């Protein structure tokens, strides 16, 4: 074969990669970009159990727990903190809070659950202790973005809804690392919200997630993956979510906020733990997510090669088509998730994803550690 033909094939490969990317933007991400929640004629209220698992989180509880305790909610609710074998002052702090907030209940765990790493056992105990059908989950290092978090999240439920996916954001701070963390959080949320809207829900985040007790016990809780430290959120949603029983809520009042990692090493450790569950996803989800990641990873190397060896005019035309599509989708999605300050950086983030996949790809084959 003539040497020139190889670079034609390379350019055609670049075009194919771009077409696949455009498919994801049009078929999946457009759904979130142009999403408008159904307007309800009458507001519903139902009892809610907020559940927070904590281990040696006294400082975070002191800082964030009041945000869950002072919610403006028109009907009965409770806040359950599962204090899982803490050695710090969590017990005494919670006892003081209970004197003021009668809706606060504490589940004290004083013995480790053998063979069940992570927070799945304490979370199961919290759900078992919950008085009400609707449970709303968050973490000790999270605070609701508004006093209407409970109210707005439970409004999402209707007769068929059993799972509600919320957005767990990070506090906005200065520095490149903060922007990288928030970009990755946004980019992940854009995917799982869009997939849910397309009838293919595959994950949620434990920082802001709600479901009904009945669906939890119907699927026997976390028994299918009790041996894995992570997965109390995404692997359960993978098991229990269907196109008809899952909804999203992206009202800004329903967001939760967390402190981002302070160093790249801390963030890398978090991502290693989170991505360790990806290998357990359903085959369709693994294929769709893997194909998207692969085409995103290959896009810029093929762009550079096409510019150098085929023809920069043609390569830049293909790049421009994808860029315009990205500009539209990212603007609308970032606006919906209150991440507009990231928008001027989106081209930088898009290029960064090439290096991101290299750094974190080993987590897909690495055995997860058995930690809380």
Task: State where each predicted segment sits.
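Cell-envelope/extracellular polymer assembly enzymes that use nucleotide-activated donors
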Residues: 46-49, 78
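A conserved acidic beta->alpha catalytic loop
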Residues: 83-93, 111, 142-143
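Catalytic donor/gating beta->alpha subdomain of glycosyltransferases that bind UDP-sugars
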Residues: 157, 163-189, 214-217, 221-285
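Membrane-embedded multi-pass helical conduit in multi-pass membrane proteins
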Residues: 42, 293-368
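Short aromatic/hydrophobic "clamp" motif used to bind/position activated sugar donors
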Residues: 135
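Acidic donor-binding/catalytic loop of UDP-sugar-dependent glycosyltransferases
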Residues: 88-89, 140-155
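N-terminal membrane-anchoring/stem segments of glycan-assembly enzymes
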Residues: 1-44, 330
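Short, acidic, metal-binding catalytic loop of nucleotide-sugar glycosyltransferases
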Residues: 66-76
